[in-house]
Amino acid sequence: MKHTAKKKEILQAAARVIRTKGYHATRIQDIADALQMQKGSLYYYISTKEDLLKGLVEDILEQSVELLGNIQDTKHKPSEKIRLCVESHLRLFHNNIDAFGILLTEDMHLINKTSEKDAFKLLRDYETGWLNIFNEGVKSGEFSSANDYKIIVKGILGMLNWTYRWYHVKAGMPIEEVSRIFAGLILNGVKK
């Protein structure tokens, strides 16, 4: 996809339309209409609808892995890194709710087929990053060694991702408060 600012605008519009109508029901014309542009003009920036899906998913997954990597590289204690990971995940969700919704509701095999990068590998890298922080916490003595952290990471990501189903900005609770509550729940469950 060409031109960064326009790319972002197109991806955001595509995410809104696809989240509302579903990937299969969305036509390029629907996205062009949402952008108030001609369908032919949209094709200047994209090749196919699959190109849009690929862009949406890869962007979210790459941001997730990058943010987690930045947290891993800090000198913080593992418990603080976990708190920051929860906050980062929910902030990314909050700022990209439509694209996040597509990632969570569309068929991952379809997503992986359209992706130049392996979407499943990016997801595994993200889980591995969390697991590495928990292992660091076990080694430092901050976290209990009696836990199966592979299962815990899957549970945490399930909890954080399920936020997509119930969280609404208008409900009155800031996403930062949700993050604080979730981080407390997680850390109380794993600390020694």
PLM regions and their residue ranges:
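Helix-turn-helix
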Residues: 9, 17-51, 55
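Short coil/turn segments at alpha/beta junctions that flank glycine-rich nucleotide-binding fingerprints
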Residues: 20-24, 74-75, 96, 140
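Short hydrophobic clusters on alpha-helical segments that form packing/core surfaces
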Residues: 10, 14-18, 64, 89, ...
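Amphipathic alpha-helical packing segments from all-alpha helical-bundle domains
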Residues: 62-65, 69, 95, 114-140, ...
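Short helix-capping/turn signature of helix-turn-helix
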Residues: 46, 105-111
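Hydrophobic alpha-helical connector segments
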Residues: 55, 69-95, 153-156
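Hydrophobic/aromatic-rich alpha-helical bundle segments in the mid-to-C-terminal region
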Residues: 98-105, 120, 138-185
